[in-house]
UniProtKB/Swiss-Prot annotation:
<comment type="similarity">
    <text>Belongs to the small heat shock protein (HSP20) family.</text>
</comment>
<dbReference type="GO" id="GO:0051082">
    <property type="term" value="F:unfolded protein binding"/>
</dbReference>
<feature type="short sequence motif" description="Cell attachment site">
    <location>
        <begin position="94"/>
        <end position="96"/>
    </location>
</feature>
<dbReference type="Pfam" id="PF00011">
    <property type="entry name" value="HSP20"/>
</dbReference>
<dbReference type="InterPro" id="IPR002068">
    <property type="entry name" value="A-crystallin/Hsp20_dom"/>
</dbReference>
<dbReference type="GO" id="GO:0042542">
    <property type="term" value="P:response to hydrogen peroxide"/>
</dbReference>
<dbReference type="InterPro" id="IPR031107">
    <property type="entry name" value="Small_HSP"/>
</dbReference>
<dbReference type="GO" id="GO:0005783">
    <property type="term" value="C:endoplasmic reticulum"/>
</dbReference>
<feature type="signal peptide">
    <location>
        <begin position="1"/>
        <end position="29"/>
    </location>
</feature>
<dbReference type="GO" id="GO:0051259">
    <property type="term" value="P:protein complex oligomerization"/>
</dbReference>
<protein>
    <recommendedName>
        <fullName>21.9 kDa heat shock protein</fullName>
    </recommendedName>
</protein>
<keyword id="KW-0256">Endoplasmic reticulum</keyword>
<feature type="domain" description="sHSP">
    <location>
        <begin position="65"/>
        <end position="187"/>
    </location>
</feature>
<dbReference type="GO" id="GO:0009651">
    <property type="term" value="P:response to salt stress"/>
</dbReference>
<dbReference type="InterPro" id="IPR008978">
    <property type="entry name" value="HSP20-like_chaperone"/>
</dbReference>
<keyword id="KW-0732">Signal</keyword>
<dbReference type="GO" id="GO:0006457">
    <property type="term" value="P:protein folding"/>
</dbReference>
Length: 206
């Protein structure tokens, strides 16, 4: 009897656990900027970043942001004259950031590396007498890609790094206008045309 009662209790616990899992909201709903947002972006922002922030992916998820954008969050705005992309890269030196443009595909690529605390001292041989009590700042490599829309002059891209913010400006082609939608003529007889043909046939028979 005791074994039967124990099995019943375990079955009830399993059922309750399953209900809790089913009632839990989707994880993506807790993330303000995730893969669903990227797929809905009309400018097709392409995201990839093999970065490893302090604490790993779990720490980034707990902080409410995907690991893919933890090191280099960005904004993209369009003005009448240009597209302006700003990327937060605090602690990243100018020599550790690279901006590339593929003119054929109109893809702008920003990549870089934020070095871990103490890396510079180790390279310069300044380890003697230095003790690190804490190193929490995220470190790792990152890269972000953006496909520029037609009309962006990817041959005149300019970039500037100030106070940990990288600003990339892509001017627009002067006088560029997007293609107007082409109206397609529809072939085939409409209801009115068919009625006219019937009337003509009737008169001919008379």
């Amino acid at each position: 009897m005791a074994a039967v009662a124990e099995r019943e209790v375990l079955g009830m616990v399993a059922a309750v656990a399953a209900m809790v899992v089913m009632m839990a909201p989707p994880a993506a709903a807790l993330v303000p900027y995730g893969y669903g947002y990227m797929l809905d972006d009309p400018f097709r922002v392409l995201e990839q970043s093999p970065l490893r922030p302090a604490g790993g992916v779990a720490a980034a998820a707990a902080a409410g942001e995907p690991a893919a954008v933890a090191l280099a969050r960005c904004d993209w705005k369009e003005t009448p004259e240009a597209h302006v992309v700003t990327v937060d890269v605090p602690g990243v030196r100018r020599g550790d950031v690279r901006v590339e443009v593929d003119e054929a595909s109109r893809v702008l690529r920003v990549s870089g590396e934020r070095r871990r605390a103490g890396a510079a001292e180790e390279e310069e041989g300044e380890r003697d007498g230095v003790r690190w009590h804490r190193a929490e700042r995220a470190a790792g490599r990152f890269w972000r890609r953006f496909r520029m829309p037609p009309g962006a002059d990817v041959g005149r891209v300019a970039a500037r790094l100030d106070d940990g913010v990288l600003t990339v400006t892509v001017p627009k082609v002067p006088g560029h206008r997007g293609r107007e939608p082409r109206v397609v003529a529809i072939d085939g007889a409409g209801a009115g045309d068919m009625e006219a043909e019937v009337v003509k046939a009737s008169k001919a028979e008379m």
